[in-house]
């Protein structure tokens, strides 16, 4: 409730003037509240006059209230009539005035929040929001075309794929001693160290011990008592940029002591897996994989480095790769010339135990099933990653291009006997694989433009089986 208090003064004429001004100022606010109450149809019991009890309601307030209730007119604060006080004949106030009475006007607005007065001139109607011409339709669930059963979801489930073989052990859960006793493939000693200053990883292959006796798949191996081991190093998943140690002749306890560096950022090195594969070299037979060791580099403190003895485990790769060859092909229709660039090779199969390899490439043009021309590169001594950058040109008319084939054969130069075969590919009409066919097709679609591509070398038997052109060359 709001309280408005009137306190008249009893100081003669000045007090009467002050009292009048105070009443006028108070009545402005009082009448404003009365106006708001009258608009809301307030009842009589909402206005109470409190003062020193007993007290009578002033006549001017009674007149204002009765005029508001009748609705004859609405008075502002300045239009409210003031009833003068009745004085005694001697000019003094009555006993009720001289008692310094305090009049308080109490105004209670009980429903101000719930009932807001509307303007007498503007009638604001509530705005209704809605979507015009909206149709209400009942939503019906869609009917399934067929009834599904749990068997429909699990009909492709094959339980035999998830059955456990009690005889197979998880290699990761076995210790090195358990792996060694189970597979008996020997152990490998190596170390790693990362150089933060130069951003490269150094892998040191130290030695191996207790390697198993050699295995001959075709019966052509002469020495079945000793192995000729070497180690291939790569950072998975990249197996192309691998390193290879030298071959140690006739020993089951080879000592390598060789270091290899991989240029790789530190964060990238932590995502790689170091793979070391021990291979048995045989000049007259294919090279056999003895075993492997894999180390996730995220589990190793590369900066601090460390040494490990790890037991070799069997590898799913029984044969080593023969190497890769980078070639460029370009055909000039106006001149009828087929240009071939032998750029480089990498990770070629080693053909000499002591000196590595002296590789060279022989290029032979076959038209249909007839050998037409033979050319070859120079040989590079003691390397398995040769750089050639040699160009060759063959006369091939445009009408004969579709029937042409190029046979690329990598040999290891041998002055004492016949050259050692390393690998072969065929590009052209009788390509030896999808990669070779794709290279030839790209060259035919882009004349006068050199097209480069890496190719993985294949064995002689594989090329002879899929390409008739391979049978026409030596």
Swiss-Prot record:
Pfam families: C2. The modification Phosphoserine is found at residues 118-119. It is a peripheral membrane protein. Residues 184-310, 321-455 form the C2 domain. Plays a role in dendrite formation by melanocytes. Keywords: Differentiation, Membrane, Phosphoprotein, Repeat. GO terms for biological process: calcium-ion regulated exocytosis; cell differentiation. The lineage of its organism: Eukaryota, Metazoa, Chordata, Craniata, Vertebrata. One of its GO terms (cellular component) is exocytic vesicle. It is found in: Membrane. This is Synaptotagmin-17. Residues 96-112 have a biased composition (Low complexity). One of its GO terms (molecular function) is phosphatidylserine binding. Belongs to the synaptotagmin family. Residues 60-112 are annotated as: Disordered.
């Amino acid at each position: 409730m709001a309280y408005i208090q009137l306190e008249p003064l009893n100081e003669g004429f000045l007090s009467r003037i002050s009292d009048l001004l105070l009443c006028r100022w108070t009545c402005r606010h009082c009448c404003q509240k009365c106006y708001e109450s009258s608009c809301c149809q307030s009842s009589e019991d909402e206005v109470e006059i409190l003062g020193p009890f007993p007290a009578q309601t002033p006549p001017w307030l009674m007149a204002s209230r009765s005029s508001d209730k009748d609705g004859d007119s609405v008075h502002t604060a300045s239009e409210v009539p003031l009833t003068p006080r009745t004085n005694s004949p001697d000019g003094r106030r009555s006993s009720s005035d001289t008692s310094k009475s305090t009049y308080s006007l109490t105004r209670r607005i009980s429903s101000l929040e719930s009932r807001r007065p509307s303007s007498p001139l503007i009638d604001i109607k509530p705005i209704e929001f809605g979507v015009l011409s909206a149709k209400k339709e009942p939503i019906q669930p869609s009917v399934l075309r067929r009834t599904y059963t749990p068997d429909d979801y699990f009909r492709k489930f094959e339980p035999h794929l998830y059955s456990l073989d009690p005889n197979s052990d998880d290699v990761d859960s076995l210790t090195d001693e358990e792996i060694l006793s189970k597979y008996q493939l020997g152990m490998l000693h190596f170390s790693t160290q990362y150089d933060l200053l130069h951003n490269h990883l150094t892998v040191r292959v130290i030695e191996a011990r207790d390697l198993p006796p050699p295995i001959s798949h075709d019966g052509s191996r002469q020495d079945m008592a000793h192995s000729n081991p070497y180690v291939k190093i790569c950072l998975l998943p990249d197996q192309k940029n691998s390193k290879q140690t030298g071959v140690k002749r006739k020993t089951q306890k080879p000592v390598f002591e060789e270091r290899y560096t991989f240029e790789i950022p530190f964060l990238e090195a932590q995502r790689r897996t170091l793979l070391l594969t021990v291979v048995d070299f045989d000049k007259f037979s294919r090279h056999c994989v003895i075993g492997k060791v894999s180390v996730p580099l995220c589990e190793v403190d590369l900066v601090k480095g460390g040494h490990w003895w790890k037991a070799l485990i069997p590898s799913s790769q029984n044969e080593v790769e023969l190497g890769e060859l980078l070639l460029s092909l370009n055909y000039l229709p106006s001149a009828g010339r087929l240009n071939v660039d032998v750029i480089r090779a990498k990770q070629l199969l080693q053909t000499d135990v002591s000196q590595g390899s002296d590789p060279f490439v022989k290029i032979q043009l076959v038209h249909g099933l007839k050998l037409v021309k033979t050319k070859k590169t120079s040989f590079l001594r003691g390397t398995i990653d040769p750089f050639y950058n040699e160009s060759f040109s063959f006369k091939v008319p445009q009408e004969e291009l579709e029937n042409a084939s190029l046979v690329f054969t990598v040999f290891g130069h041998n002055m004492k006997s016949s050259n050692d075969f390393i690998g072969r590919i065929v590009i052209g009409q009788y390509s030896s694989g999808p990669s070779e066919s794709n290279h030839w097709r790209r060259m035919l679609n882009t004349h006068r433009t050199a097209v480069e591509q890496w190719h993985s070398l294949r064995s002689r038997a594989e090329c002879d089986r899929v390409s008739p052109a391979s049978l026409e060359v030596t």
